[in-house]
Amino acid sequence: MAQSTTTSPDGGTTFEHLWSSLEPDSTYFDLPQSSRGNNEVVGGTDSSMDVFHLEGMTTSVMAQFNLLSSTMDQMSSRAASASPYTPEHAASVPTHSPYAQPSSTFDTMSPAPVIPSNTDYPGPHHFEVTFQQSSTAKSATWTYSPLLKKLYCQIAKTCPIQIKVSAPPPPGTAIRAMPVYKKAEHVTDIVKRCPNHELGRDFNEGQSAPASHLIRVEGNNLSQYVDDPVTGRQSVVVPYEPPQVGTEFTTILYNFMCNSSCVGGMNRRPILIIITLETRDGQVLGRRSFEGRICACPGRDRKADEDHYREQQALNESSAKNGAASKRAFKQSPPAVPALGPGVKKRRHGDEDTYYLQVRGRENFEILMKLKESLELMELVPQPLVDSYRQQQQLLQRPSHLQPPSYGPVLSPMNKVHGGVNKLPSVNQLVGQPPPHSSAATPNLGPVGSGMLNNHGHAVPANSEMTSSHGTQSMVSGSHCTPPPPYHADPSLVSFLTGLGCPNCIEYFTSQGLQSIYHLQNLTIEDLGALKIPEQYRMTIWRGLQDLKQGHDYGAAAQQLLRSSNAAAISIGGSGELQRQRVMEAVHFRVRHTITIPNRGGPGAGPDEWADFGFDLPDCKARKQPIKEEFTEAEIH
């Protein structure tokens, strides 16, 4: 290095200043010498300058350029040693931030993905995002639903979000908040404010945040609003601050600057807020996401959404229980089977699903229609009535120790001989009266015999009223049996007593052969006492019978039936015990039967000769007129 001998007074100071400003490892090259000499005076002022020759001119220009390039590379590596985009750090950094900005102007591709991930990732520091306890009052400016993982807040209102980590993250860690659309058909769109709020003066004057950003940070001057140059995603980044003493959360105040219902913006499309914990070099240490809704009344909308969610859960549970029954093979029918007509309606209460069944054949269709109508009507029947019906069926199916009722004694061999041509049972068999001189009648009476046996063992007829009443009406009806008029909707004795609150008294009536309420119409309180009904139930049953008789208007034929039925059903003997008799429920009946009359001593026989037959004297005999006798001489002898 050569130095001139002549220097100005300020030359040394200037040189020292320039020399100290140079970096110690910089390399300098000399420029070509100008045509002027070193000692040439300019403008009449004597000046001199020092020239440094660090390289000789003999070195080629290409070699000097290569040396300059290597020197610049070393300088850039020291200036940005922490950049995640250098080859030295590419292998050491496992995960980069999807929202990190390019570190070099030569990068043409953005590292941020087109569709950011919204999967929760606690990471090594157990990153968590929580909210304070909030209410659903209509006056609340924000509220969070843990059930739905959804934040409800008003526009431009402060919403505190708590950040928690289990261990301190590395220095320089930042927290990023980015909005994305929730549904797949909208996820590629960028979430921005609507033009009305973006261009308006409200909430925009005096703000450092860009007008198009939806999310803002309040009370933090270190926040940065980022617009990805390739994907266009907008986000806001704030440095991570450790929690203060005595707390375990770091609170960040966010503002949402547009309503979810704004046209031109979100337009009622649901959004997700993605909160990520990132290092300085862009590595994601944790990720959390939740749904956001910006509305006018957060408390009301939260309550409505939670109620709807619970209803859907109940329906899903009900469908899951009935899922096995709905998955059947008969859902798929052959294509040749015609479809059901418009009259078929498949609707079930409490079930949203509708199923259609195709059936071949009209008869099968009608059977299934009856089943369908029965099931639909079953849903309309009150549960207490169903329980009463089931109790009645259990009582009817209970085995009884009593002998089953019979329609009279079995025909004796003598009756078979004399009545071999008959097809129908005799009058005596229908009314339960034993035939004369029949020793087999007494043991065959059973619990529903035709008469009662007194203490002496003689038969006492108890159905004289019924015989006389039907004797005058035997030729009125043209059929064997005319059905009675509709008395009551449910004539069952079990239903009647259950409705009165006396189900314990059923056995007292059924043990005596009383199975219908029409058998009890003319009972008195004394009769109920004879049936050994408990005293606390007697008055209730008697009043129920009185109300039943007053509420129904029976015809004359029905009244005759009731009188005859009760007369034949209840008879109190000398011992006070009640015996069961045979009851026939019929309004009119006519029996055609040919009987054999033995010889009674000629035409002079009186009416006393007919007393042993057990029925009234025929009109023809009372008028002394001969009756038709249908028998052969061989039968007489």
UniProtKB/Swiss-Prot annotation:
CC terms in the record's Gene Ontology section:
cytoplasm; nucleus
Record motif PPxY motif, residues: 483-487
* Domain (SAM) ranges: 485-551
Q: Where is this region: DNA-binding?
A: 131-310
Question: What's the family?
Answer: Belongs to the p53 family.
* Cofactor info, note text: Binds 1 zinc ion per subunit.
Q: Which positions make up the signal peptide? A: none
Give the free-text miscellaneous remark of the entry: Activated and stabilized by interaction with RANBP9.
> What's the protein here called?
Tumor protein p73
Listed GO MF terms: DNA-binding transcription factor activity, RNA polymerase II-specific; metal ion binding; RNA polymerase II cis-regulatory region sequence-specific DNA binding
Q: How does it assemble?
A: Found in a complex with p53/TP53 and CABLES1. The C-terminal oligomerization domain binds to the ABL1 tyrosine kinase SH3 domain. Interacts with HECW2. Isoforms Alpha and Beta interact with HIPK2. Isoform Alpha interacts with RANBP9. Interacts with WWOX. Isoform Beta interacts homotypically and with p53, whereas isoform Alpha does not. Interacts (via SAM domain) with FBXO45 (via B30.2/SPRY domain). Interacts with YAP1 (phosphorylated form). Interacts with HCK (via SH3 domain); this inhibits TP73 activity and degradation.
What is the required cofactor set for this protein? Zn(2+)
On this chain, the residues bearing Phosphotyrosine are 28, 99
